[in-house]
């Protein structure tokens, strides 16, 4: 495995739903059966926050605002080590399928069941108190 770590940024995109916060998941590019958060590379000169917003736009057609930093996860894929820095992104948009990906909005429990990877489930659990506070119904 390479000693270099590939830095990426991801977005936990949320919006207010009729019965509580809704969480956006998209299918993976390499494996369309995997459900994940929008994420990807950080362009040269781009901040992690801006990269997270760009990935949400590119992969799900959603424009939003970074509301909080959620945390980071690391994983190995092939011969590389990745570190993904996640941000909670709020939006009032529904998005549109892009880049050959499907997208779905889920409640918290449904998102936990649908997410493919344990690391993503752990990240959602960590971010959930912040999401609930941000999208508290008035």
Positions of predicted regions on the chain:
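N-terminal strand-loop-strand
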Residues: 1-37
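Structural detector for helix-capping/boundary residues
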Residues: 9, 40, 54, 106-109
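The catalytic Nudix box helix
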Residues: 37-70
């Amino acid at each position: 495995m390479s000693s270099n770590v590939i830095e990426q940024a991801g977005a936990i995109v949320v919006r207010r739903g009729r019965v509580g916060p809704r969480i956006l998941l998209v299918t993976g590019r390499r494996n369309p059966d995997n459900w994940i958060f929008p994420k990807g590379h950080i362009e040269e000169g781009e901040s992690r926050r801006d990269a997270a917003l760009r990935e949400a736009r590119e992969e799900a057609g959603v424009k939003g605002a970074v509301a909080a930093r959620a945390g980071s996860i690391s994983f190995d894929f092939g011969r590389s080590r990745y570190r993904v820095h996640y941000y909670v992104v709020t939006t009032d948009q529904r998005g549109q399928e892009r880049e050959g990906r499907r997208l779905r909005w889920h409640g918290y429990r449904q998102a936990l069941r649908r997410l493919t990877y344990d690391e993503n489930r752990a990240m959602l659990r960590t971010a959930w108190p912040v999401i609930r506070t941000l999208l508290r119904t008035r």
